[in-house]
C-alpha cells in the first residue's frame, strides 16, 4: 500500500514538470520575440520587422490614432517608400509581465526609444507597450501591438 501511495504521489508531483518546462520555453520564446522586434528596427530591416507579425496583425498606435490592420497597411505605415526611412539607433525593451494561455501570449512592458527622421532625433525616455502574440506553424508572431508614452517628455534635437 505504501508503494502505491508513494507511486501516485510521485506521479502527481512530476506530472506538472513538462507543462512547467513548456511554459518556461514559451516565456523565453516570447521574450525573444519582444527583443527581436527592437533588434530588427535597430538593424533597419523592414522585412525582418514585418516577419514578426501575423498577416492579420493590428497596430493600435499611441495618442488615439486609428488602428492599422493587416500586413500591407502596417508595412505602408512604417516603411512607406515615398518617405525617408526612420532610423532607430536605440530601443530598450523590458518585458515586465508575460501571460500565456494555450497558443496566445501577452507581454506587457516598458521601453525607451530613440529614433531619427528628417534631421531630428527624438527620444522617448519611457513608455508602455502591450504585445499579443499567437503561436502558429512558424512559432510565436505578433497579432496585436499597442504602445503609449507621454509626448511632453519627448526630447528632440537636430541630428548631427
Give residue spans per PLM region.
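Short, low-complexity N-terminal intrinsically disordered segments enriched in polar/charged residues
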Residues: 16-55, 154-160
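Short beta-strand edge/turn micro-motifs at domain boundaries
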Residues: 126-156
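A short, structured loop/turn motif at beta-sheet edges
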Residues: 98-105, 133-139
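Bacterial N-terminal signal peptides
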Residues: 6-15
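Positively charged n-region of N-terminal signal peptides that target proteins for export
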Residues: 1-5
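A short hydrophobic beta-strand element
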Residues: 103-113
Amino acid at each position: 500500500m505504501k508503494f502505491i501511495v508513494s507511486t501516485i504521489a510521485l506521479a502527481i508531483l512530476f506530472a506538472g514538470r513538462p507543462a512547467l518546462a513548456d511554459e518556461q520555453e514559451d516565456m523565453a520564446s516570447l521574450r525573444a520575440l519582444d527583443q527581436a522586434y527592437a533588434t530588427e528596427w535597430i538593424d533597419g530591416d523592414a522585412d525582418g520587422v514585418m516577419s514578426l507579425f501575423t498577416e492579420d496583425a493590428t497596430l493600435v498606435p499611441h495618442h488615439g490614432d486609428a488602428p492599422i490592420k493587416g500586413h500591407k497597411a502596417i508595412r505602408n505605415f512604417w516603411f512607406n517608400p515615398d518617405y525617408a526611412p526612420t532610423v532607430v539607433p536605440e530601443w530598450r525593451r523590458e518585458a515586465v509581465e508575460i501571460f500565456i494561455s494555450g497558443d496566445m501570449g501577452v507581454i506587457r512592458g516598458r521601453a525607451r526609444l530613440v529614433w531619427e527622421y528628417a534631421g531630428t532625433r527624438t527620444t522617448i525616455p519611457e513608455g508602455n507597450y502591450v504585445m499579443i502574440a499567437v503561436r502558429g506553424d512558424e512559432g510565436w508572431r505578433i497579432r496585436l501591438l499597442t504602445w503609449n508614452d507621454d509626448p511632453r517628455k519627448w526630447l528632440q534635437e537636430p541630428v548631427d
